Amino acid sequence: MILMTLGVLQLPMPLAMSMPGGKPILALALVGMPINVLSTDTIGKILAGGASVCNTAGIPIAGGHTIDSVEPIYGLVVLGLVHPDRVKRNDGARVGDVMVLGKPIGVGVLSAALKKEVLDAAGYESMISNTTKLNTPGPELAELNGVHALTDVTGFGLAGHALEIARGAKLTAYIKWSDVPLLPNVPALLKSGNVTGASGRNWDGYGKEISLDSGVPAECQALLSDPQTSGGLLVTCSPETVPEVLAIFKRHGFHDAAIVGHIGEAQKSRLIVNA
């Protein structure tokens, strides 16, 4: 067995833990709080939230480190085990692989709406539910021989992490936009101007590698690069493995898991998005 470490940094957002193929065994908490600004009650709730997620994952917080910080920071270093033969990287995709996404996207749009105080209770609940849902299918997916690449969609958005898969395999990824699951009310909120600055910076960084079909809606660009807090797992697998992959997601309660594209031979663009 080899040791696996996963760093998870969260600001004032729900804590979530990614487990793309390994089994976590313990966590160390890294805490920085403005002690002259936040009450001990608020800090206690943040710590309790982290402990709750670790309890759900079945691991203890075995220690950690605290500092006085200008901004609130809470994170975990997670230690775990994974068999060397079952390490799933983001560079193993093969031509003909199907891409499956475990969670809907749009967290960045919802968080932008929250900051502007235009997010309703239902939208807030969907954001919290999505971001606090642990990616528990990871270890089971890693056991499947037909799964060739595995990563989680986080700060670089769906496009950024699909690009990482395509670059790593020296192939081209295809996304069918109409099949990408979105969190409720995200398109309407986006049209109202609720977008993060990170989305634009992401696109500035990698947009030149992406080709958008003429039928793709205008909001697609901002959502493809929308940063996700605790986004879903992005899997590439052989076509015959797809039913088992989807069944694993469903069994873990990921009912929005969907086929979003495929992997093809290398083209001029590393990522091609069709309507």
Regions found by a protein language model. Give the residues of each.
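Active-site loop/helix belt of alpha/beta enzymes
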Residues: 129
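Non-catalytic interaction surface on structured domains
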Residues: 120, 141-144
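A short, well-structured juxtamembrane/interface segment
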Residues: 133-140
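Glycine-/charge-enriched secondary-structure boundary and capping motifs
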Residues: 1-9, 35-37, 42-60, 67-74, ...
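Glycine-rich phosphate/pyrophosphate-binding loop regions near the starts of catalytic domains
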Residues: 1-125
